[in-house]
Amino acid sequence: MNVVYLHYHLNHGGVTRVIANQIRALALTYTDPAHLRFGLLSGGSADNWKEDLRASRQMPEVLIGVLPRLQYDSQSGVEPVELATDLRRQLAEFGFGREDTVLHVHNHSLGKNAALPGALRRLGAEGFALLLQLHDFAEDHRPANYCHLLGSRDHGDLFEHLYPQASHIHYAVLNSRDYSLLWQAGVPADRLHYLPNAMPEVPHLPDQAAARRTLQDRFGVPCSGLFLAYPVRAIRRKNLGEALLWAALFPSDLQVGITLPPTNPAALSHYERWKQLAAQLRLPVYFELGGANGLPVAEVLAAADRILTTSVTEGFGMAFLESWMAERVLVGRNLPEITADFVAAGMRFDHMYDQLRIPVGLVGRAAVEEMLCEAYRQLVHAYHLPDPPPNVLSELIDERTHNDLIDFADLNEPLQEQILRRIVAHPPVRQEILALNPTLAQALAAPDFERQNLIHLNRQVVQRSYCPAVSGARLCRIYDKLLTQPRDVSVTGLGPENRLLTHFLTPNRFRPMKG
């Protein structure tokens, strides 16, 4: 069996790490490793991938092909037929035939390369077995990506184009939510696979006291008080304002550490504003603790008393697994539609909240209503869709401001900033918010034995349900099934209505900072 993984780039990041873990997991569990060969195709950008491979344990030989037409494209200059030709030629150079090769493609429909969906459809029509793994959706608050794919098509035509259907074209998803979405959109259950990410063992962490001293020496983080590490690249949907809110609510009890700045220029302005605000308000928040000029992530985790997450959306939600493997309790924002699978496996998230309630009156109802309506209109318009009707906007306002409270994550950055300034200027506001959200103080005050029991429980579940061996077994079953399917060269689509777009743009899924 030959397995060829395909992604736009091999830079450090989530999907690249997933691919590396999948290769390791499959090599670990495949019953006939002598007859298992790996290929890897990307657009050519690969920050130290080969060095990572050489340093990695349990990594087999991988043939690497570079296809420049596979890179991110800002304009639709590449024709699908050209990219299909490149892919076909590279597979032939690997010596991989159509009959015993699975092409495992990550995020083909995300809108990073407008030619890729059409190229894959051509290969599918020629009988190549395809596993299309979806981590993220262009339909989910990514209008620029979606419109790049849309071009001159209408929405129904694009839906047909993006999600090809045939007996030898299967889909893999990270969670039950996405499984349900694709099934409801028309993907047959026998071509749809639940494929959560594998969670490798975390290397042994340094001594906590030594790591705290290093943080103090390098970044001025005091050794006193609790240290909450937020190991994240601070893009907009990571909801950095809420991390600052933790610091504002407990200014003398804790410090918050953010590891990485965004690399996307569009996110930098928000990030720099949060840095300026933290300095102005003298909040105990420390930035860029990781990366090239910072500390290794293991040292930041070692220094932490808790791991924090405030993200408003995730694909798989690796953050909900990693903290327990690092033997640290996770606090902050729960994402129930993501963590539902983890809870079903036996995990508990006792010190997390689904909402962080804020009195609407702190910023004014008129400002909140105007912000929600305008932000939702802008999102809908960005997808080239008509203005939402007034009753939809009214329902959005009523649902988000029930009992004159609003979730902090439903505010945009300017309104979040107003809340932070009010807390610092008027200490009674701090107590009002803490009274509405008792989970925050409870998460910090939980006794050691309780935290250790929770860590032990969740760590066992992660090791049992999300280990590389389990992931490898899943991959084996999926690939074996794909290779035994009849090669139906009649490739169809899912129908004229983009049900995924309809789902993701419903008001109850809207967040101002998801983009």
Regions of interest found by a model, annotated:
Residues 1-515:
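Catalytic cores of nucleotide-sugar-dependent glycosyltransferases that transfer UDP/GDP/TDP-activated
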